[in-house]
From Swiss-Prot:
This is Oxygen-dependent choline dehydrogenase. The lineage of its organism: Bacteria, Pseudomonadati, Pseudomonadota, Betaproteobacteria, Burkholderiales. Its EC number is 1.1.99.1, 1.2.1.8. Signal peptide: none annotated. Involved in the biosynthesis of the osmoprotectant glycine betaine. Catalyzes the oxidation of choline to betaine aldehyde and betaine aldehyde to glycine betaine at the same rate. Belongs to the GMC oxidoreductase family.
Length: 565
């Protein structure tokens, strides 16, 4: 491959990069080079295409960067997982397929920051709708002709889902019919990025399938970006490794970094854009001393609150190898059955205290007791709630350790560094126990398996969190958007102080959103794609949305009072 020129070079074919590649090449006169360090999204590989197989990609390195954190000082010095997608689709190729946009007040809060006024919820909602085709049809909140297929859970899938939602309502929390609609707060069915044929709806399937055949788009897989090239303070191209070759490509207009919250700051730092003292430690020539690159790192931490199930209605039999061929065959031939669901079909968001302005705790309900990555399966019928806080005040960082593009960076989330973190996790455990002991779950609920009913004091719960809490795989905010001293990009993703360079992915979120990050990342890319193309922004929505305004976190007393601790 010889040196080539393109209008735009995109580094990373993930949740954001595929959106940009597809939208930019809608203009036939625009040429785009899309670089992806991983391989194709093989459609015959059940590990990435079958929703129920979501744990498999995290267990290897074909589709997973398999990063690990530095020892986390507040988590028993554990090195914790930080899985990130590798291959066309990026993390949308290996994520849990939960389609959660965040709370409207997340975006309204962004919009209170200097010059981010056009990131308010009603400005973002049209781009959420543009990206989506929802199986039950469009409305003021949902799209009907977008690239990403979204399936919402239907009644009757598993009695545990309906019982867990009803238990939340019996505990005094709201019921909501749509976690992405008028009111996120409450318990209800989950939307999922799954096609009508029961396949994972990654951005490779949804977006790139529209664009692959365009003559103005060149996709190169197994292409690891090494450095961004500069002429003074202008980005002019990228060098990347492709097989044994080092290749240079030039960008006539812009370089677009879409490598995610770990690899985007890593690439910027390796190219000489980042905290000057970090770069000098590795003898990297400083193009721009930009102190926020790699800082402000955020994530969601979660726990598994697990119970024995007294009736044989859980997914426990599906974990047995002798039942899996039948499940796989039905999925492969018909796109139906247990294989066609990620099994996160119900969940919710609550405020644990009345003075929380919007939900601070998320629930994913699952009708089996097992870790997200497929490990530590409980050998009995069981069910669980994945529970975690949404907007931790703790902040971490991504720091380059080597100029070698194959080397992983130093990652420290600094989980649970603040007193509020501990209060919210204790509140979450106690609220979950109260939900689980409501009458709706009486016929199913057996023993509490984790943390264990004997753990009651603050110290005992804190010990459990330190030892057992895990990442929800939502790294973000490490190249934050804004105009303060630690901001990396402006309101259109343009890197401060550099021409011809943008970052467009979850790393530019100023503050993490309330929920899973795939849907917000796609929205961010859709919105910035219009700015790159100099299109007029989509018309602002006038949809109504719920604001608590000091209302009690619970609308009524629980049907069954909490156990005395």
């Amino acid at each position: 491959m010889t040196t080539r020129e393109f209008d735009y070079i995109i580094c990373g074919a993930g949740s954001a990069g595929n959106v940009l590649a597809t939208r930019l090449t809608e203009d036939p006169g625009v040429t785009v080079l899309l670089l992806e360090a991983g391989g194709p999204d093989y459609r015959f590989d059940f590990r990435t295409q079958m929703p129920a197989a979501l744990a498999y990609p995290l267990q290897g390195r074909r589709y997973n960067w398999a990063y690990e954190t530095d020892p986390e000082p507040h988590m028993n010095h554990r090195r914790m997982e930080c899985g990130r997608g590798k291959g066309l689709g990026g993390s949308s190729l290996i994520n849990g397929m939960c389609y959660i946009r965040g709370n409207a007040l997340d975006y309204d809060n962004w919009a209170t920051h200097k010059a981010l006024e056009d990131w308010a919820y009603l400005d973002c909602l049209p781009y959420f709708r543009k990206a989506e085709t929802r199986d039950v049809g469009p409305n003021d909140y949902h799209g009907g002709d977008g690239p990403v297929s979204v399936t919402t859970s239907k009644p009757g899938v598993n009695p545990l889902f309906e019982a867990m939602v009803e238990a939340g309502v019996q505990a005094g929390y709201p019921r909501t019919d749509d976690l992405n609609g008028y009111q996120q707060e409450g318990f209800g069915p989950m939307d999922r990025t799954v096609t009508p044929r029961g396949r994972r709806a990654s951005t490779a399937r949804g977006y790139l399938d529209q664009a692959r055949a365009r003559p103005n788009l060149e996709i190169v897989t197994h292409a690891l970006a090494d450095r961004i090239l500069f002429s003074g303070k202008r980005a002019t191209g990228v060098t990347f490794l492709h097989g044994s070759a080092r290749v240079t490509a030039h960008a006539r207009r812009e370089v677009l970094v879409c490598s995610g919250a770990i690899a985007s700051p890593q690439l910027l730092q390796r190219s000489g854009v980042g905290p000057g003292e970090w770069l000098r430690e590795l003898d990297i020539p400083v193009v721009l001393d930009l102190p926020g690159v790699g800082r402000n790192l955020q994530d969601h931490l979660e726990m598994y609150i697990q119970f024995e199930c007294k009736e044989p209605v859980s997914l426990y039999p599906a974990l047995k190898w002798w039942n899996q061929p039948k499940i796989g065959l039905e999925w492969m031939l018909n796109g139906t059955g247990l294989g066609a669901s990620n099994h996160f079909e119900a969940g919710g968001f609550i405020r644990t205290r009345d003075d929380d302005p919007w939900p601070n705790i998320q629930y994913h309900f699952l009708p089996v007791a097992i870790n997200y990555n497929g490990s530590n399966a409980i050998e009995m019928h069981g069910f669980q709630a994945h529970v975690g806080s949404m907007r931790s005040p703790s902040r971490g960082r991504v720091k380059l350790k080597s100029r070698d593009p194959h080397a992983h960076p130093s990652i420290l989330f600094n989980y649970m560094a603040e007193a509020l973190d501990w209060r919210e996790f204790r509140d979450a455990i106690r609220a979950t126990r109260e939900i689980m002991r409501q009458p709706a779950l009486d016929r199913f609920r057996g023993r509490e398996l984790n943390p264990g009913a004997d753990l009651k004091s603050d110290n005992e719960l804190d010990t459990f969190v330190r030892a057992r809490a895990e990442t929800a795989f939502h790294p973000s905010c490490s190249c934050k958007m804004g105009y303060d001293d630690m901001a990396v990009v402006d309101n259109e993703g343009r890197v401060h102080g550099i021409d011809g360079l943008r970052v467009v992915d979850a790393s530019i979120m100023p503050i993490i959103t309330t929920g899973n990050l795939n849907a917000p990342t796609i929205m961010i890319a859709e919105k910035i794609a219009d700015r790159i193309r100099q299109h007029k922004p989509l018309e602002r929505s006038n949809a109504q949305y719920y604001v608590a305004n000091g209302a009690p976190a619970r609308g009524g007393k629980p049907a069954r009072a909490p156990a005395v601790v």
